[in-house]
Each structure stands twice: as structure tokens, then as C-alpha cells.
């Protein structure tokens, strides 16, 4: 399989684990918080949905508009695996940037899932149809430890971010006080 096939498979895989983790939850389960400073399933799902569109726009409006610079490829070698590892490590907490912070008034399950599915479909369609080489366009991640990423790695970041917060949803569901129904 090509790199693009791998990216699509990863996006489809993270979509499935997220949908499986949120399937069939009651309103009480959806809004349950293990502690006042912890996110509910609703807040995690909304953050995933908002982030998907935000990062996709960053890829299409900023990363892909940077001039192709194949000479920069050495800067990002080995970061594919690093992105996946870093994002799945839940021992390192991060604070969501204000536009992606769901704490105001969480969306309903239907709203979050609809937004997520629409955004994910656009991301997958872009990967399948763009004629540009995703490995030739670069943009710096705001977290210095991550640094410069190519467009392909930004796509991996979308999927890894979904998986990270799906793990967070599973943590919420594993809480002993999580409603039985």
C-alpha cells in the first residue's frame, strides 16, 4: 500500500475506535464527569470534532500553501512514529487552545458525531484526491518538542489526536462512578 493508503487506513481506524467508544451512551453517560476539572465524554467528543476541522483547515489553508521544499525532508525524518507515540501517551497532559476548548456548552452527541464524521470525510477525500506531494510541504507545530512537520505528518497528527482523546473517553467510561446506563 502507498503512504496515502496507510494514512486513509489510519484515519478510518481512528474513526472506528472513536465511534465504538461513543456508541449507545445515554445522556447521563455522555455528560458524566469523574471530577469537576476532568472532561466528560461529551467534552472529549466535541474537542475531537472541533479539532478535526481546525487541523484540516490548517493543512489545506496553511501547510499546503507553503512552497514545496523537498530539501526540508531530512528535518522531519523519523517523526511519523514520534507523533503517534507522543499523542498516545496520556501521562503528558496538554491544555486545549481556546477555540478548541469544549467547556462552554457541550454539543449534543448528534452534533459532535455529525461534525466529526463530516470533517473526517473531508480529510479522507483530500488525502485520496490531492495531486500535491504531502511530504514536500512543511509547517511548524506550536509545541516546540514537535517542531516542523510535513503535511503527511499533520494528517497523522489528526488521527493520533483522535486516538488520544478516545483513550480519554475510555478512561471516563472506566471510572467506578460512570453511570451503568
Task: Identify the residue ranges that each predicted region occupies.
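Amphipathic alpha-helical coiled-coil segments and their boundaries
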Residues: 4-7, 105, 109, 151, ...
Amino acid at each position: 500500500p502507498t503512504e496515502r493508503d496507510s494514512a486513509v487506513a489510519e484515519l478510518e481506524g481512528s474513526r472506528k475506535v472513536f465511534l465504538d467508544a461513543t456508541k449507545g451512551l445515554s445522556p447521563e453517560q455522555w455528560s458524566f464527569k469523574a471530577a469537576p476539572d476532568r472532561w466528560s465524554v461529551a467534552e472529549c467528543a466535541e474537542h475531537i470534532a472541533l479539532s478535526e476541522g481546525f487541523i484540516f483547515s490548517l493543512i489545506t489553508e496553511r501547510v499546503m500553501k507553503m512552497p514545496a521544499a523537498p530539501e526540508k525532508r531530512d528535518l522531519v525524518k523519523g517523526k511519523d512514529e514520534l507523533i503517534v507515540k507522543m499523542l498516545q501517551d496520556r501521562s503528558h497532559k496538554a491544555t486545549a487552545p481556546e477555540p478548541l476548548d469544549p467547556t462552554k456548552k457541550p454539543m449534543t452527541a448528534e452534533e459532535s458525531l455529525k461534525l466529526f464524521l463530516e470533517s473526517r470525510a473531508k480529510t479522507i477525500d483530500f488525502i485520496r484526491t490531492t495531486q500535491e506531494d504531502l511530504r514536500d510541504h512543511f509547517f511548524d507545530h506550536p509545541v516546540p518538542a514537535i517542531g516542523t512537520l510535513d503535511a503527511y505528518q499533520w494528517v497523522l497528527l489528526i488521527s493520533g489526536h483522535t486516538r488520544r482523546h478516545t483513550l480519554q473517553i475510555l478512561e471516563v467510561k472506566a471510572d467506578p462512578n460512570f453511570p451503568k446506563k
